[in-house]
Amino acid sequence: MTNIGDLLGNAANDLLQSSINVGDVYLLNLDPSNGITPKNDDATRNKFFIVLGFDNEGNVIGGLVINSKINYNLPSTVTDYQLPITVKQCPFLQHNSFVNCSKIIVAKRTKFCKETYRGEISDSKMMKLIIDTVKESPTINRKQLKNFGLI
């Protein structure tokens, strides 16, 4: 039997999924289908996900992940497009980190719920810098930028 808490939880998640905004940050469980490589033989990995845009149907969300540190084993086309982000800018972070602007990660809208919401990038200058860096990244093509309304 469905209880009122379940109904309200579902309604709250439906409402949240219909009001996801560019700059919102979620802690999502991602896997290779999202373009994430899990570590230590794990199947998935929890990553902070910054919403960048939506596909034409609004079902798929494009965004960026936040990494704790830069992996300098990767080519400069990746490492040069890591923007520092501080705990002061994003209080939900446990330590200063880096926004990976070299790769748009894709997630279905159903992954986003009230339990995974962590906050937003409220500094408009920082959000503009993130988007501009994504647009300049040599590893992101125009089709990807267009798919998520970035150009």
Feature annotation, model-predicted:
Residues 36-87:
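Compact nucleic-acid interaction/catalytic patches
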Residues 2-11:
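Short, structured beta-strand/loop micro-motifs enriched in basic residues and often containing a Trp
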Residues 2, 82-151:
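C-terminal terminal-subdomain/extension
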